[in-house]
C-alpha cells in the first residue's frame, strides 16, 4: 500500500501547458498546443467565472474550460459553484437554439496538476466540528455536478477530460464522468483516501465497478497507490496518450480526425449511458455512506489528512514561484506578437 510520505513526494509540479494568449483565434494545425483567449460574457453568452477559464472555439464548435483554482488545486466550494454555473450556462446557451456545440473539453491551468480532489482542509474542520451535514452537502454538490457531466448535460456533445497533470482522489473521480480521457504521459492517477481511513465517495466506485468490475475497482480504491497514465491506458480508463506538453494538440488531433464519425460516436456514448446507467440517487446514497465513515476518523487519520494539506500548500508555493519566474518571458513573448 502507498505511504503518505510517498504520496507527498509524488506531488511535484512539472511545467504545465502553454499559457493563455490573448489574441484572436487564427486557423491552426492540429499540432499546435495553444487555445484562444478566455471568453467574454457576450461571446457567446457565457459567464465570466472566478476559477474556471472558458473559451468557445467556433471553428470546431468546441468549448474549452480550464480550472484556475484560488489556493490549493482542489475542489473547493467556490470551484464547485463555478462548475455548476458553467453547466447552467452551457445548457442555456447551447441547448436553446444557440451556436452548435460538438465538444466540451475540461482541463487545468495549474502546473503539474489536474486536481488533487476534495477540499481536505474543509473536511478536517467539519469532521472535528462534528458537522456531518456539511460533509453531505459538499458531497452532494460534487455528485450533482458529476452526474450532469456524465450525462453530457443532455446535449448531443462529446465530453473530453484533458489531463496535463496529476489527478488524485476527487480529481480522478471527476475525470471518470467524461466520455473521453486524453492524458499526457507520466501524469499520475490514484485514490489516496484509504491512507487516512476513507474512500472516494463521489462516484469512483460506481464508475470503476461498471468499467473494470467490482474486484478491480475495490483493488484500485483500497491499495492507495498512484498509477501512471500509461497504466490507466492499459486498463482502458485513459483513451488517448499524449506526449508531455502536447495534451491540447492531442485533443485537437482527436477532434480533427473525428469529424466524419462524431455523430455516431456521440450516439454510442449516449447509448452506453443507458446500458450502464448511474442514477443520482445511487451517487447520493454513497455520499451518505462516505460522510458517516468520515465522522469515525481518528485524530491520527485527521493528522494524516492535514499533512496532505500541507503538502498541497507547498505544491502551490512551488507553482507560484515557477509562474513568477516565467512571467517576464511570457510578457516579452506576448508583446513580440
Q: Which residues are covered by each model-predicted region?
A:
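A structural preference for short, pocket-lining loop segments at secondary-structure junctions
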Residues: 60, 83-131, 144-160, 186-187, ...
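Long amphipathic alpha-helix in the N-terminal Rossmann-like dinucleotide-binding domain
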Residues: 138-140
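Catalytic cores of alpha/beta
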Residues: 170-171
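Crotonase-fold acyl-CoA enzyme core
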Residues: 46-54, 64-69, 151-166, 177-188, ...
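Hydrophobic/aromatic residues within transmembrane alpha-helices
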Residues: 106, 119, 174-176, 232
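Conserved CoA-thioester-binding segment of acyl-CoA-metabolizing enzymes
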Residues: 2-105
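C-terminal long alpha-helix characteristic of the crotonase
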Residues: 239-301
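C-terminal non-catalytic accessory extensions
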Residues: 3-4, 300-337
Amino acid at each position: 500500500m502507498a505511504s503518505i510520505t510517498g504520496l507527498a513526494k509524488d506531488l511535484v509540479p512539472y511545467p504545465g501547458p502553454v499559457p493563455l494568449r490573448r489574441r484572436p483565434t487564427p486557423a491552426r494545425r492540429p499540432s499546435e498546443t495553444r487555445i484562444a483567449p478566455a471568453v467574454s460574457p457576450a461571446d457567446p453568452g457565457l459567464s465570466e467565472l472566478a476559477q474556471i477559464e472558458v473559451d468557445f472555439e467556433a471553428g470546431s464548435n468546441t468549448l474549452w474550460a480550464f480550472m484556475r483554482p484560488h489556493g490549493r488545486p482542489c475542489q473547493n466550494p467556490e470551484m464547485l459553484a463555478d462548475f455548476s454555473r458553467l453547466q447552467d450556462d452551457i445548457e442555456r446557451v447551447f441547448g436553446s437554439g444557440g451556436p452548435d456545440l460538438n465538444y466540451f473539453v475540461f482541463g487545468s491551468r495549474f502546473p503539474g496538476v489536474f486536481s488533487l480532489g476534495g477540499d481536505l482542509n474543509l473536511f478536517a474542520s467539519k469532521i472535528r466540528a462534528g458537522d456531518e451535514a456539511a460533509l453531505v452537502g459538499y458531497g452532494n454538490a460534487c455528485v450533482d455536478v458529476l452526474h450532469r457531466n456524465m450525462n453530457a448535460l443532455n446535449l448531443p456533445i462529446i465530453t473530453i477530460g484533458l489531463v496535463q497533470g496529476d489527478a488524485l482522489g476527487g480529481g480522478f473521480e471527476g475525470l471518470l464522468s467524461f466520455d473521453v480521457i486524453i492524458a499526457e504521459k507520466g501524469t499520475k492517477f490514484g485514490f489516496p483516501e484509504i491512507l487516512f481511513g476513507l474512500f472516494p465517495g463521489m462516484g469512483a466506485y460506481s464508475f470503476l465497478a461498471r468499467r473494470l468490475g467490482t474486484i478491480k475497482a475495490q483493488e484500485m480504491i483500497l491499495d492507495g497507490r498512484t498509477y501512471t497514465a500509461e497504466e490507466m491506458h492499459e486498463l482502458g480508463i485513459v483513451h488517448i496518450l499524449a506526449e508531455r506538453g502536447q495534451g491540447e494538440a492531442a485533443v485537437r488531433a482527436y477532434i480533427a480526425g473525428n469529424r466524419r464519425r462524431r455523430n455516431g460516436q456521440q450516439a454510442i456514448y449516449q447509448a452506453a449511458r443507458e446500458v450502464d446507467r448511474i442514477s443520482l440517487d445511487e451517487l447520493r446514497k454513497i455520499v451518505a455512506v462516505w460522510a458517516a465513515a468520515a465522522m469515525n476518523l481518528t485524530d491520527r487519520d485527521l493528522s494524516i489528512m492535514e499533512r496532505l494539506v500541507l503538502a498541497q500548500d507547498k505544491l502551490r508555493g512551488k507553482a507560484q514561484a515557477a509562474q513568477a519566474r516565467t512571467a517576464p518571458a511570457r510578457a516579452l513573448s506576448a508583446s513580440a506578437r
